[in-house]
Each structure stands twice: as C-alpha cells, then as structure tokens.
Amino acid sequence: MMRRDFMRLTAATPFLFSMTPSRAASPPAGEWRTFELVYHIDLAAQKGAGQLWLPLPVDAGDYQRVISVTWKTAPEQAALTWDTDYRAPLFAAEWTPAHTDRQLAVTTVVATRNRNRSPAGGVHVVTPDVARYLEPTTNMPIDGIVETTAAKIVHGITDPDARAKAIYDWVVDNTFRKPTVRGCGLGNIKFMLETGDLGGKCADINSLYVGLARAAGLPAREMYGVRVADSALFNSLGRAGDVSKAHHCRAEYFSPRHGWVAVDPADVRKVVLEEKLALSDPRVIALRERLFGYWEMNWVGLNTARDFDLAPPASAPLPYLMYPYAEFGDIRLDGREPEHFDFRLTSRELTRQT
C-alpha cells in the first residue's frame, strides 16, 4: 500500500482522529460499564515491508458505544479505516524496509451494557442494509444441504421468531464444542453438514446458526468480538486482564417484531463442555433459554464482516477478522495463533455506572 493511500484514508476519517482522551465523548449513563482495550503489537522479528490490520470495536448504539481510539509509536503510514462492504472498523499500518521500530500500541475505550431483546412493537422493516444478511457468502452457502437442513428444521413453522427459535434449539441439540479446533474455528458450514461433524467452536457453531437462519428466510449475522471481563453467569463465559485468547463470535437474527435479536447457541455448548454439565442440567436449561435474546456485555463486539476484503486490501479475502492480522512478503501472521504472532490484547475496566 502506498503512502498516498494512507493519506487518503486519514483525510476520510477526521472524526475518528479527533477522538483523543481529552476530547472523547463521555461514557453514557445508566447501567453501563467502560473498558479500556489495548493491543500491544511487536513485529520486530519481521523483516522487509509489511502491513498490519487490527479489528476495532464497533459503535452499536443501545448496547455498545466507542468513546475513543488512540495509538502510539505507530509508523507514519497508519490510519483508522473500514472495509467498503461491511464498514468494519480497522486500524491499518504499513512498514517500509527502512522502518526499524515495529512496536506499537492501539487503545480503545468502549462502553457496554447488557443486551436484552427489545419489546415487541410496531413492524421492523427489512431494509436493504438488513436484507444483505439474507445473502450467501463464500463459506456460508444457503443452498444445497444447508437449505434442505433448514427446511426440515422449520417445517410447518411460519412465525419468524418461532422459526428462529427452532433453529437455535436444533443447533444447541446437535452441535458440540471441540476444544482442539484452532482459534474460534473457520465457520465452513457446508463442510460441517456434509461430513456430519458438527463439532467446533463459536465461529463454527454460531455460523451454522446464521447460515441455517438465512436459508430459512431470516436475516442473520455473526458478530465477532472478545470477552473483556468476568462473567456473572459462568466462569467459562468470562475473561479479564490478558484477553489475547478470549475472542468469541456471537450471532443475531432479525425479527419483524423486535428488530435484531441477540442469540448465542455456541456459549450453551461451551458451558456444557467446560463446566462439565449435561444439557439436561437445570442451570444449562436456564442458560439456554436466556441466550435466545440476551448477550451479557462482558464482551465487546468488533464487526459483522464475513468473507470480505480488508481495507487496504490484503493478498486475499479473509473469512472474518476477529484477531490481528499481518503480512510481510509471503509470511501471513494470524492472531488465531498468538504464539506465532507477538501480540497481546489486554482489558481493564475503568468505570461501572448504574
């Protein structure tokens, strides 16, 4: 990427560059928690020219608000940007072969509050921005075995929310968490259904929910993010301090009654495995019902981008961007393997307002 490309990106995002701590918005009032997330990046071992992309928190309105984004010791060719398709917020940086300092820190301050399903009221229209989440992507086809599986699940059910719940229950009942999967998984749902291997992690299980929902005519999407604090529900559903390995993908579907509705079948399966509980355990039954329409916001959402091109472009599209990603020549550094990519992501709670 050329210097002029970064200059153009910088000029296109002046409002983001003004969000320094002294000028940032105040934390919103009312049951909100404020977190500071810091990426610590060290690419000193990489030689030659290279590029880095970091996913940043998204401003999601009633349950998540970005207060500030700042960085230090970054190269001159660094900017806040977003992809042109999903508008996923990104920090991008480029090093030339002459750059010797390849360490940087990027800090985001973000406020969150627990998300519940909105009360039914009026009719929520499927706008073009919503309708795009009915479409297939490279790793999420909605024809063939995905379509036939969805049709079996929702057979005889016409109400959209009931269809969404039927798919949620099917995913919870038929998948399982596989701890050996790298990172959060790839979300190749066609492969999962064709092989009958429905084991995986959050990007597999929740992507399966999203793909089946789309195939059943329900707009749905993943939200990629990271856990940033301990959970009030189960120990396995929280992480604080060093959250470099605390990434987690969630899901949501669009309801004519409620708008976007939060769901998380993958966390039900995570609790079953890591808390050593059966699906029939009363605590799991309660969690299962709760996570259809609820997100505990000890987690920060990053983006809903799927099978997309980074901005500026990388060598190839990515299935998703939930972790840091870098390219130096033919070397690809994937944050799903932090042992091969010298980065840390830390979280610190700043305030809690009620």
Residue locations for each model-derived region?
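Active-site neighborhood of thiol-dependent amide/isopeptide-bond enzymes
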Residues: 156, 160-162, 169-249, 256, ...
